[in-house]
Every structure is written in C-alpha cells, then in structure tokens.
Amino acid sequence: MSQKRKHDDTPGDASSASKTFKKHRPFKPGQNHQQTKHHRRPNLSHDDENGRSTNALKSRIRDLKRFLTHMDSVEKHKMSAGARQERERELEACEHELAEKLNASREAEYRKKMIGKYHQVRFFDRQKGTRILKRLKKELSALEDDSKKTALQQRIHNAEVDVNYAIYYPLMKPYSSLYPKSKNKKSSDSEEAEDTGEDSKNSAEVDGPKGDVNMWKAIEEAMQDGTLEKLRYSKDAVPAEPPKKSKKPKAKDSKKEKSVSKTSHDASASHNYAVQDQDEDSDGGFFE
C-alpha cells in the first residue's frame, strides 16, 4: 500500500511560503506621492558642433565687457596688465566666433529660402532637359548618316549643359529658368501647343545657351574643370547683413512732452474747479 504524503510536503505550502508581501509605506500628509517627473535631456541640436551656442557666447561677451568696465571704473579692483590682456583676447575671440556663427546661420536660412522658392522651376527644367537628352541620344544611336552626327553631338552636349544647369545652378542665386513660359499666353494657345507634333517641339526648342547665359557658360566650363559642386555651393550671391536699426530718442522726448502737457492741463483744470467751488460757497454765504 502506498503511504500518504505528509501535510508539510504539499507543493501549495512551498509556493505560499515563497511569496513575498509588499510593504505599504505609511501615508504622510506633507509628502508628495505623485510620480517623480523626469527631467528632459537638453536638446543639443540647437547648439553648434562644439557645444557653444550663440546665446552662451552673447552672455560671455556681456560678462567680459561688464567686468572690464568695472575694473576701469573702480580703482581698488585694478588687475594686472597680463590678466587684463588675457581677458581682452578672450573677448575678441568670443566676438569673432559669434560673428562667424551668425553669418553661418544667416547663410543657411537664406539657402533654405532660395531652395524652397525655386525648387519647382528647377525640377521642371531638369525633367524637360533629361527628356530632350534621352531623345537626342536615341536619335544619335539610330542615325546612319555620319555627316549629321557632329551637329547632333553638339546638341547632345548642349542638352547635357542644360541638365547640369538645372542641377548645379548656385543655390544662393535667384534662378533663371531655361524654358520660361510667357505670362500673356491664353488657354487656347496652350491647348493648341499640346496638340502639335514633334516637329513643332523641335522647332520651338532653343539650342545653345539659354536662361542666364553667363551662368550657362560658367556651368559649361565647370563641367570641363570638374568644379560643379563648388559652383553650386558658392556664396557670391549671399546678401550683406542689414544694418542695425538705431533707436529714435525723439519719440521718447515727444512722449515726455505729451505727458508733461497732460499733467499741466489736468492741474489747471483742477485749479479752475477749485476756484469755481470757492465762488459758489461764497455766494451761498452772502445770501444767507
């Protein structure tokens, strides 16, 4: 006969014994039991590559200027010539670094503005130029007459320049379209142009320099020299920094004059009311 297991050997008791009970902390009225808020990590994307933002540079420049002016004004707090020269060098370095960062941010903002402004026109010019280039290459492969190949190869070269014109035109410079549409065309004229065949398209295409002619020739030279990327990111067309607006002290003086005149007018009015009240009181006493 099988023996019965003892009560202590049951698995239920072992599992119950292994369970741990959570201890409840006593409630304190002054203690905040809400979850602790996690502090956000600082966003370093607004800072520069070296970690120093423009705001930090501005505050450092302001502190250095205040420190130097304080040392000049207070005789007791004079510093040695070497320490002062070190502070002045630090101030010049901070001002130079701040000017470079401001120029870089201004150029980036201007580049972003110009890219967004002429993105659609450049895209359409590039699409049309690639279509023309593919068609000309197809014609060259099917052409059997050697006498016409030289002229067709020149047209292919011009089409390649057109495509590079749309891609590598300087981003900072206002874009001049290769295939501008006249604003005075009517809708009927556009519908008739769509119905025409390839012969009319070929006759309408302008072969050779177009758009900004000087830039078209510059891109052709850059293709030979291999400097297309340099031409695209050139900074020659970046506008100069606008001059800072000077404060107008005359406006403040006029405001002060208005306030003074207003106070004098109120004072005279109150004086007139007081005189009138005195007259009324004196008249009443006479008739009594």
UniProtKB/Swiss-Prot annotation:
Segments for region (Disordered): 1-58, 178-288
InterPro entries for this protein: Efg1, EFG1_rRNA-proc
One GO CC annotation: nucleolus
Domain of life the protein comes from: Eukaryota
Chief location: nucleus
Regions annotated as coiled coil: 83-154
Biased composition (Polar residues): 266-275
Biased composition (Acidic residues): 277-288
Keyword set includes rRNA processing: yes
UniProt keyword annotations, A-Z: Coiled coil, Nucleus, rRNA processing
Recorded family membership: Belongs to the EFG1 family.
Function (record text): Involved in rRNA processing.
Record's protein name: rRNA-processing protein EFG1
The species this protein was found in: Phaeosphaeria nodorum (strain SN15 / ATCC MYA-4574 / FGSC 10173) (Glume blotch fungus)
